[in-house]
């Protein structure tokens, strides 16, 4: 039976005899599917940092746009998904949402193998990848409907927490899985990956008004391989020539009959980069150690295919749908009505969810590119993907841990203090000089502060899963809608955060303007949370199962009145 005829999770007898097993089975299967939804959503953010190294000529801002566009798609799609579950049910929505993500993954896998693939093609693929984030607004409402209020913080914390591990999965697995031919030649050959690091102290460059006047070779072993050509007091050229001990960089590539690369032999050597003005004057000279090796970037997309197929089968076979009172798609917009002050609380919840999950997803998408652009220009620059997975991992894990705590102590309390921590992290980044470093000595501190930011966003986000159904306690359907609605707007986080950080860096040279604005926004959100939900006597307070909620304090008559108002009665 695809649709369950009866579902009363608040009935203790029904929950014990029937509901609990079905609800936890549903949570387990949908969480497995959600992991790979998040992974496919963020796969572009992991791939973009590798595109320049395999030959794609995109600007820094274009790379930020590629990392951002899945977030734009996910936010837009969540606005649609937020109304699906009450109307269509869990089984068809989650099943279709799972299998359709094969389209962008397969397309992306082939696109990265062709250096002629244009920026706008990648933008379309990135937009489609956003389907993996869009369906989150179907997962959360589904889970909220299946569980009683006392377990909603726990169940949704588990689902969102483990589901968010998908972000860590993509950023952790990608560097490893693109390093070998996991699928053989079945899905294509390798690309040529180039890594070039400046040799510290190899040369001393003297400039006058931005033009190189002299180049002194400091390392004796390089003196016989590098020739500085001068005309008077101006350097005209710097020429590199191999010696018996100093080798240039050569690439040994084997191709098939169609001209496609089938093998790349790893090589390393020395390269001299000479930067010139359009008029020919030399503006910079660097000597680099260059490594070229094979890389199978397509694996970063293709390896999700079997897992998506497995998740689809599990969803189609084992999931069930619950009948929820809904008044069609038009009725779903009643969370924006003035009845029972729904509009006010919809606005408040949207702001706080953007603050929590919007920040988590936004920083998760932007973190690799932040590392690359802020610290990637220094000698021995860190690999962004070696650190990027840590933030989402911490943020996802803390959701699972703190979900039960906010059931006990209250969602509004669980949001108040972590948001203060987020404000502190913004100020530390700004005033600690971590956004305008002069060397790598600031990098460890930058990483620690960003990981603290992820910890705080995850903690606060876990509290929302408890709080929002309590705010709309008079209508389980509206509580489910609110989780979908707020999730839709917060899913724009990767788009907004990544694009604004990229713009700030491009236009001002640092991300300081972004984090200053973020701190102000967080302060506003925390004020709303305190005024309406946390302070003594607030309108819809939530002090957890131990301290009670606004709904618990109402009389039966007051509760029935709110329900009648909600239903136009």
Give the ranges of each region predicted by the language model.
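Central cavity-lining transmembrane alpha-helices of secondary-active solute carriers
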Residues: 65-83, 389-402
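C-terminal membrane-cytosol helix-exit motif in multi-pass small-molecule transporters
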Residues: 303-328, 525-533
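C-terminal ends and interior cores of transmembrane alpha-helices
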Residues: 99-115, 420-440
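Extracytoplasmic gate region of multi-pass secondary transporters
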Residues: 41-49, 171, 342-396, 461, ...
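Flexible cytoplasmic inter-helical loops of multi-pass small-molecule transporters
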Residues: 1-7, 186-196, 275, 280, ...
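Glycine-rich segments within core transmembrane alpha-helices of 12-TM secondary carriers
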Residues: 133, 153-179, 484-497
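Hydrophobic core of transmembrane alpha-helices in multi-pass small-molecule transporters
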Residues: 104, 118-134, 441-461
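Cytosolic juxtamembrane N-terminal segment immediately preceding the first transmembrane helix
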Residues: 1-39
